[in-house]
Amino acid sequence: MNIKIVCVGKLKEKYFKDGIAEYVKRMGRFAKVKIIQVPDEKAPEKLSPAEMEQVKEIEGKRILDKIKDKEYVYVTAIKGKERTSEDFAKELADLTTYGHSDITFVIGGSLGTSNAVNKRADDLISFGKFTMPHQLMRLVLVEQIYRAFMINSGSPYHK
């Protein structure tokens, strides 16, 4: 299985980098994991709704350039479907069973993802109604993917 995580912006904090690197290393026995960072669009603090959409569109094009046609795509979104860890693990197992060996996860920038990115998604996934910094979302996402692998392997990691 190939897991790709496409995210907007650079990860600066060492503690996030270290945590993500640890989970990516642990997942090595289950999947090849690749994290691709696309540049965030520089914008002033206060934006009009039209300017927000423009920023999302620019970032969206950068995201879509990193996604291939055959990939199954999850986009993280507050309005996405919430799942339990067990449900998510079953979904990943089912995807591989039914021929999806290339799975891509998208984490948008601080304004979210464009309509074009959301339309490309095979599924919108939510990790709750809370708003999180996208840097933290990367760590949460890789931990949940790792947890899914551990559930599917029967490991006691998930109790």
UniProtKB/Swiss-Prot annotation:
Its EC number is 2.1.1.177. One of its GO terms (molecular function) is rRNA (pseudouridine-N3-)-methyltransferase activity. InterPro entries: Alpha/beta_knot_MTases, RlmH-like, tRNA_m1G_MTases_N. GO terms for cellular component: cytoplasm. It catalyses: pseudouridine(1915) in 23S rRNA + S-adenosyl-L-methionine = N(3)-methylpseudouridine(1915) in 23S rRNA + S-adenosyl-L-homocysteine + H(+). Coiled coil: none annotated. It is found in: Cytoplasm. S-adenosyl-L-methionine binds at residue 108. Keywords: Cytoplasm, Methyltransferase, rRNA processing, S-adenosyl-L-methionine, Transferase. It comes from the Bacteria. Signal peptide: none annotated. Homodimer. Specifically methylates the pseudouridine at position 1915 (m3Psi1915) in 23S rRNA. Belongs to the RNA methyltransferase RlmH family. This is Ribosomal RNA large subunit methyltransferase H. It comes from Lactobacillus gasseri (strain ATCC 33323 / DSM 20243 / BCRC 14619 / CIP 102991 / JCM 1131 / KCTC 3163 / NCIMB 11718 / NCTC 13722 / AM63).
